[in-house]
Amino acid sequence: MKLCVTVLSLLMLVAAFCSPALSAPMGSDPPTACCFSYTARKLPRNFVVDYYETSSLCSQPAVVFQTKRSKQVCADPSESWVQEYVYDLELN
């Protein structure tokens, strides 16, 4: 029992020091979400509720669509349907 308490305490201590909030220097930007591949299919427009563009720090540009089911789907910003969806979302 004493060993379990010691191991659990040690694991909690390690987890606290490995926390992303503690490992980043103060004032630094949060981790950036990047896309490494795009969806091969056009999403149904009624599934998409929001979008954002990936950071310029990413290796390739992307538009990330948020779906009604809270999924995030990476899309190629040069595709015409992606540009149409972004335009439509900006208007609404």
Swiss-Prot record:
Annotated InterPro entries: Chemokine_b/g/d, Chemokine_CC_CS, Chemokine_IL8-like_dom, Interleukin_8-like_sf
Single GO biological process annotation from the record: chemokine-mediated signaling pathway
PTM text: N-terminal processed form MIP-1-beta(3-69) is produced by proteolytic cleavage after secretion from peripheral blood lymphocytes.
GO cellular component, one term: extracellular region
Highest taxon, organism lineage: Eukaryota
Signal sequence coordinates: 1-23
SMART domains for the chain: SCY
This protein's name: C-C motif chemokine 4
Organism name: Homo sapiens (Human)
